[in-house]
Amino acid sequence: MRLINRLFLALLSCTLSVGVFAQTQDSTVVAAKDSVAPKKTKVFLEHANTLSFDKERNAEAQVLNGDVCFRHDSSYMYCDSAYFFEQTNSLEAFSNVRMEQGDTLFVYGNYLFYDGNTQIAYLRENVRMENGQVTLFTDSLNYERIPDIGYYFDGGLIVDSLNQLSSFYGQYSPSTKLAIFNDSVRLENEQFTLYSDTLHYNTDSKIATILGPSIIVSDSGTIYSSRGWYDTVNNTSLLLDRSQVVSGDRILTGDSIAYNRELGFGEAFGNMSLQDTAQHVMLEGQYGFYNEKSEYAFATDSARFLEFSQGDTLFLHGDTLKMTTVDSLYREVKAYY
């Protein structure tokens, strides 16, 4: 019997380049390379309780205080006070900053610099981006209205209805629902924790795409993989590039593994091996599977069984081998030709 998981995931990638934002002595940030230059439109001041000029501090700025509101196309920006640079089509906003884009995207922070020509918002201090059930937390966020991507570069957290993901660098697109994480990535779920170097995550499907060395730890065991995907809703996964599933003393290895954590069922394709480190036995084949709950294993196509508990190694070959657990000490192996 084979467990066949048929789930197709479109892997999206984003090529990054480096840009520098020097406003108020800010840090180097990473910008999306594929960003299309937006059409230049004017930023409008919609409301402020007071408007004044301070030529000594900044001759080019309109000084605004009280219930300040700006509009740029379909986006609105609110704050307690601001500097409006009409000639350069930009603004600085201070205290209780809020950006609204339609009725689905809201961004909050203590400080905002917005460039109306590039349509990039630089938010700092206690930043929060809300998009439906997805919330992003960080202290430094750059948001490009075109192509609708927000990214942090000094630590951040993204939370949805099921998972919590953190990393040093991350980005999120409200339109595609794709989040990308790099460096010290951690995905926390009620049933497991995933540690990775590089991870993509879809906040709609709740599928995490593994793109670097990763470890998934749960009460039932540990998974080691550097490429593949994990469905956090159904606890199913496809693991590639010689991944391993460890359950107690048993280690299942294969070129690719389809694994269902709820059923405790792993199906390995290509150079499959199941090692019992306590009993010093191993089952090998080009295809096989292992049921953790029944402790039943199957191997076929160049199948062989190895027993090496006594120093010398005993080999058993067959077209198909089946291994069952008799008790805590004994395994029964049957060979078929």
Per-segment meaning from a language model:
Residues 1-28:
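Bacterial Sec-dependent N-terminal signal peptides
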